[in-house]
Each structure stands twice: as C-alpha cells, then as structure tokens.
C-alpha cells in the first residue's frame, strides 16, 4: 500500500471499471463486480490488491496471488492459481499503470500559501526566502533550509540538517545531520516506462526515498523514489555532485560515489563501497560490501565483496591490467600507431 503521507487513496474500483480504463478484458465476466482498493508488487499482492505479470520468468510468483487481481497476457492465464481474478491484456504493465492512476494520486502542494499552516517546524528551524513547504511536512530542530527550496507534502526532515538553495525534496524521509546541496532533487519519479497499445506510457512510481543519518547529497544529484518500496541511502554515505541513484536502489552505510556515477534501478550496494567518477552500474545487480568500482567503469555483472573492478565492461582489476598489458604488447608497446 502506498504511504498515505505521500499518496492519496482515490477509493476502490470494480474490475469491470479497471478493464474499461485499461483496455483489458475479464477472464471471468462474473468477477466484474469485485472491488480493488490498491496496487501492489507481484510478490506481496493480497486480497484487495491489483498487480501485473509481464516477465515469464516470474510465473512461479503467481502461486501466492490467491485473492488478488492480476493483469497478464492471455497465454499465462493457465498458470494463475484459483481465486486470483485475471485481467487479460497484451500490455500488462501499461494496463496496470492505468489502474494505478485510478486508485492512487500523488499529494501535491496546493500553492495557496508557500509554507502550509499544517506543516510542523521544530525550534530553531531557519527558512530562507522563497521556501515552499507542503501540508503535513515536518522539519526537525536546528535544520537550515536555503532559498528556493521545495519540501513536498508529508516529507519528514530530521534535526541539524542543511538543505542548499533550490533543492527539491518529495516523497522522502530524511534523517538527522543530512546535507543536501544546492539543486539536488530527492524523491522524483524513477524511470519506468512500458509499451502500450498507443505508444509508451509512464509507470507510476509509488514508493519513497529514505536518507539515513549523516548522508550527504551533492549539488544537482538525483535520488529517485522507489517504484513500490524505498530507495535507501545508508547512514553516513557521501554522494558527490551530479550523481544519479535510480529507483529501488539500496545503498549501504559509509559508501562514497564520485561525480557522474550512475546506479541503475534495484541494484543493492553493500556497506563501504566506493565508486570512482563516471562509474556506471546496470540494474538488478549486487555490489558486495567493501568493493571498489574504478572511474568510468561499466558494471554489467554483480561484484563480489571486497573486490576492485574497472574497465568496460568492468572486470577484476588484475585481469584488466593483464589484458591491457597484452593489448599494449600486441600494438607494439606504444598503443595503436597513427600515420607517420
């Protein structure tokens, strides 16, 4: 269930209504009156929830869906358990997105007053000119908020934080002693898109961002909120300027990421990992605790704990050095020769 501090519940809908909105069809017309109240990921959908299956590799996950509703392709209907109502479509993700928009809406600042009267500011909070704070937001003692900062509805900011000019924070829970530098964007929608019958559609991002105590986010860096769950930056981790952390990433404690690092969605990073500048990490990987990723490395496979990887594609440092030396020898020891 999306966090009600950040998302408004628009009320239940019948399966018949969702089928009409999404372009799907009911596998069993008798289920058209069944009510759905919220969306959920496939692995945790229960009674009252609607989810989707688009990846055939996850067919085994259908077994736990008794009482839930699922968008899926017609050829996968036979794999669903009894008691799971089905909405059949060739575009499960896009159809689910239409249902999600019907059931949930992001809470937005109404704009009537820059600082909403329903926000809570503890003693010693300093607000510079031009700050916008949404309904239900809470800011802890001693926090300093720079000019032009936007803090969205429901956001919780801890004590003794420093928020730089023009930073934007939404859909987020921020710990104590966190520094967010100028222009950083925390909690915007992660990149989710799927093909639909009339073209590509955006997938709703219904999760949050959690910044634990002592985190630093550099200028103009972005940390996207999760698709369903949380994007988490662990305690005392330090992120440089111009870094992008995608949705559902879990970054451990005491990690460092130099400028232009990009960490793709749902990657899990252990404690004490260091990323050199311009390092790129593909999605759904695991970077083990204490690993080091070299500058400009492109990581397409999970990295074991404590290892140092670099290169394109990234591989263990000793292997990269050996292969680079071999290439140099083959090129005559002086690289590739140009024209004399």
Swiss-Prot record:
Pfam families: Hexapep, LpxD. InterPro entries: Hexapep, Hexapep_transf_CS, LpxD, Trimer_LpxA-like_sf, UDP_GlcNAc_AcTrfase_non-rep. It comes from the Bacteria. Pathway: Bacterial outer membrane biogenesis; LPS lipid A biosynthesis. One of its GO terms (cellular component) is membrane. Keywords: Acyltransferase, Lipid A biosynthesis, Lipid biosynthesis, Lipid metabolism, Repeat, Transferase. Coiled coil: none annotated. Disulfide bonds: none annotated. GO terms for molecular function: N-acyltransferase activity. PROSITE patterns: HEXAPEP_TRANSFERASES. The keyword Heme does not apply. It catalyses: a UDP-3-O-[(3R)-3-hydroxyacyl]-alpha-D-glucosamine + a (3R)-hydroxyacyl-[ACP] = a UDP-2-N,3-O-bis[(3R)-3-hydroxyacyl]-alpha-D-glucosamine + holo-[ACP] + H(+). CDD domains: LbH_LpxD. Its EC number is 2.3.1.191. Belongs to the transferase hexapeptide repeat family. LpxD subfamily. Catalyzes the N-acylation of UDP-3-O-acylglucosamine using 3-hydroxyacyl-ACP as the acyl donor. Is involved in the biosynthesis of lipid A, a phosphorylated glycolipid that anchors the lipopolysaccharide to the outer membrane of the cell. Homotrimer. This is UDP-3-O-acylglucosamine N-acyltransferase.
